[in-house]
Swiss-Prot record:
GO terms for cellular component: cytoskeleton. Involved in the biosynthesis of ring A of the aminocoumarin antibiotic clorobiocin. Catalyzes two consecutive oxidative decarboxylations of 3-dimethylallyl-4-hydroxyphenylpyruvate (3DMA-4HPP) to yield 3-dimethylallyl-4-hydroxybenzoate (3DMA-4HB) via the 3-dimethylallyl-4-hydroxymandelic acid (3DMA-4HMA) intermediate. One of its GO terms (biological process) is antibiotic biosynthetic process. This is 4-hydroxy-3-prenylphenylpyruvate oxygenase/4-hydroxy-3-prenylbenzoate synthase. The gene is cloR. The lineage of its organism: Bacteria, Bacillati, Actinomycetota, Actinomycetes, Kitasatosporales. PANTHER family: ADDUCIN, PROTEIN HU-LI TAI SHAO. Disruption phenotype: Cells lacking this gene are unable to produce clorobiocin. Gene3D superfamilies: Class II aldolase/adducin N-terminal domain (3.40.225.10). GO terms for molecular function: actin filament binding; metal ion binding; oxidoreductase activity. Its EC number is 1.13.11.83, 1.13.12.23. Signal peptide: none annotated. Homotetramer. Pfam families: Aldolase_II (PF00596). Its cofactor is Fe(2+).
Amino acid sequence: MSKALANMPGDDYFRHPPVFDTYAEHRAYLKFRHAVALRHFARLGFDQDGLAGLITVADPEHADTYWANPLAHPFSTITPADLIRVDGDSTETVDGQRRVNIAAFNIHAEIHRARPDVQAVIHLHTVYGRAFSAFARKLPPLTQDACPFFEDHEVFDDYTGLVLAKDDGRRIAKQLRGHKAILLKNHGLVTVGETLDAAAWWFTLLDTCCHVQLLADAAGGAEPIPAEVARLTGQQLGSHLLGWNSYQPLHEATLARNPDLAAMAPALPPQTPALAR
């Protein structure tokens, strides 16, 4: 281990996600965080493209079923009760009354299947993510914030229209491999996380990094961080635990702006620190 990594605070320095005794408690927690994440992305303007945009979260109990925001429901008013549970094979809604965006779900379900370590998958149509994706190139480590994605994201450069076939979703999942993000050419960004909060942080950060890169390109280019330094910085900042912790201020700020949703927060285990709420 390098001295720089050895000097990093250990995992015990940071907060950790809560642990639940029952599936029901865990599910209620995930659905609440799911709704808060959608409200967060609404504030960023990531829900302005009609029917596009999906966050899926694996159900903690029922294999190959995933909680999703329903088709055509505004992110800005979503609540846990609005979320639907969708079967990964049939794409039928098994809990709730609404339908899911099939094209997006075909991507998400195949990623979940290929990556059982992933709790959440996020794909939203953002301005900067779509613009940068059109170049079909990886994001350079231009800044410290981009380093968590250095050697930890991929590009899918075969845009063929809506992903209406499961095979197309499988190809995207295969290209993603074990990474935390993938840029879909002419389409946008996808991030994944071992926790929903980490996936939400990676998505927020990745879109910001795309914005920075586009600004730098427009100004005539910029010098990226050397590979060995970018790799080290990515190891320092790119863990899913750091991603989870980095998202907590955004979660708390979203609750402060949405008291109606904050009032729906489920009870947490007694040992859970306040920051994990």
